[in-house]
């Protein structure tokens, strides 16, 4: 049995970025752990999730939820084991996931989006990916907003990231042609040869328009947009009449001081002429329906035989580096940070 320490190592925000997020915006610090109050429990975190939404939490501009301030522990989802408890709901030894922040130890009362993990679904860290936020995002974004039909073409930006990979799997499961838009020729090859996409395009290609036309010979019916920026403008030209655009992320503007500076060609004419439907999407709107996504994704994985890949960085001190590399697009699959005392599956 682990003996809880008097303090926990945490990743603390030392400055808000003006431009690209970098490791200098964070510092590793010790924060004291107080005694548990009634209803609380203590979690030893084993895994931290690194997600694109973290960009918005570090912006000073208004957003859909409160961000972080200088001196705060950086926000993040995590998975860990309950090591001490004053709660009737969470027992010693339970594995849980929640919005615990970038820290090794967390005190909670169950209100930080905490839920117990079913080990039968797979390794516990999958609660941060396919059976967590990424899965909810991909499933409900595609199925509820995109509403793909068999035989349609579904394109997804950040196509070999945690959400993009799942969008591809779900779309293929429903009989769609799948096209990954990625950031390198190596990822193009991986997307098609090992990750199950029908075609892939390098967004940095000098002949992007031609590449999109070749990858999507019948046009694009559903575009799952994780990036925004110039790439959105390019894909827009290939949308079919009646197409649907899911606005899920804006990682292409992560380098800007303010996202309002991300201004490209106006899209109103294309939306009008092609009768497109463009809708913003937040996974948190569907959190109460998470079991629906989990059940479907478990079925897809059983039929496909493999879990999506993970990109793991070791050590809490490396969490800022993991965030930076994810924003650069260096990862293939779910970006995770392992901080546990031992590998637990």
PLM segments and residue spans:
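Glycine-rich phosphate-binding loop and adjacent beta-alpha segment
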Residues: 230-306, 341-345
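NAD(P)H dinucleotide-binding glycine-rich loop of Rossmann-like/cofactor-binding domains
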Residues: 74-81, 89-158, 305
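Short amphipathic alpha-helix with an adjacent loop that forms part of the alpha/beta core around
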Residues: 207-218
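Short, glycine/polar-rich helix-capping loops at beta-to-alpha or helix-loop-helix junctions
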Residues: 103-104, 183-191, 262-268
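Short glycine-centered segments of the SAM/dcSAM-binding site in methyltransferase folds
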Residues: 95, 153, 177, 243-244, ...
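C-terminal hydrophobic helical "lid"/dimerization subdomain
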Residues: 1-6, 284-345
